[in-house]
């Protein structure tokens, strides 16, 4: 009876499942390393199958932007650096090489040495011409007082002045030639100079008082007599 009761109680109880086997720590880390290696190999094969994209170029930064320091306290230093870079000869040469024809204007080209020398000679010539006209203006009548005379007026006044001087020289030469030829020689009369002065001072009275003693003067002698009144 007791054995049959034990068999019934044992049949009524369910059998327990076997407990899982727990591996040691070394086996766990080896399994994790193998799984990581398999994942890396799968990722590498996937990258090889995908088309390779072109490498992206790094953005180029201008030297002016790189040289500017950050912060509000360094703004003055940044402005000075930018001003120095803008006035550097290398940057100016780069600006000259730029083509601005598409914008409707162009930068002035640097003149060659021959053109610079020619311009310098032209400036010196104009300066000398102006100095010459200033000197001529001082020698013509009323030229020193009128400093606003134009070049044309200065030349015209100089021509008139030269003609007047030439006329005086011609008349003086004519008088000298007449004296040398004996037409107005002082040996004609011992009191020639006194008579000439008296005729120059009062010709009407001398003619009226001594009409019988003097012959009428020729037109040439009368012209010479008028010339002596200038002195």
Swiss-Prot record:
Taxonomic superkingdom: Eukaryota
- Main localization of the protein described in the UniProt heading: nucleus
> Looking at the Swiss-Prot or TrEMBL record, what is one Pfam family this protein matches?
HLH
Bias kind Basic residues: ranges: 76-85
CDD domains assigned to the protein according to its UniProt record, in alphabetical order: bHLH_TS_ASCL1_Mash1
Q: Where is the bHLH domain?
A: 113-165
Transmembrane: present as a keyword of the record? no
Subunit structure comment from the entry: Efficient DNA binding requires dimerization with another bHLH protein. Forms a heterodimer with TCF3.
Role of this protein: Transcription factor that plays a key role in neuronal differentiation: acts as a pioneer transcription factor, accessing closed chromatin to allow other factors to bind and activate neural pathways. Directly binds the E box motif (5'-CANNTG-3') on promoters and promotes transcription of neuronal genes. The combination of three transcription factors, ASCL1, POU3F2/BRN2 and MYT1L, is sufficient to reprogram fibroblasts and other somatic cells into induced neuronal (iN) cells in vitro.
Specify the protein name.
Achaete-scute homolog 1
């Amino acid at each position: 009876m007791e054995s049959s009761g034990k068999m019934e109680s044992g049949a009524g109880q369910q059998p327990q499942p076997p407990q899982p086997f727990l591996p040691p720590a070394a086996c766990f880390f080896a399994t994790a390393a193998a799984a990581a290696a398999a994942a890396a190999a799968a990722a590498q094969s996937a990258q090889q199958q995908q088309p390779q994209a072109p490498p992206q170029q790094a953005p180029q930064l201008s030297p002016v932007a790189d040289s500017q320091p950050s912060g509000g306290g360094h703004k003055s230093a940044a402005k000075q650096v930018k001003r120095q870079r803008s006035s550097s000869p290398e940057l100016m040469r780069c600006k000259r090489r730029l083509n601005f024809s598409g914008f409707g204007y162009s930068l002035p080209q640097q003149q060659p040495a021959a053109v610079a020398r020619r311009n310098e000679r032209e400036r010196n010539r104009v300066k000398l011409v102006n100095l010459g006209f200033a000197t001529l203006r001082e020698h013509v009548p009323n030229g020193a007082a009128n400093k606003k005379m134009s070049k044309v007026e200065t030349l015209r006044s100089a021509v008139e002045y030269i003609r007047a001087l030439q006329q005086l020289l011609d008349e003086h030469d004519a008088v000298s030639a007449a004296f040398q030829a004996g037409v107005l020689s002082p040996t004609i009369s011992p009191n020639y100079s006194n008579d000439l002065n008296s005729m120059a001072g009062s010709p009407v009275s001398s003619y009226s008082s001594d009409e019988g003693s003097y012959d009428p003067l020729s037109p040439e002698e009368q012209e010479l007599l008028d010339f002596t009144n200038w002195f």
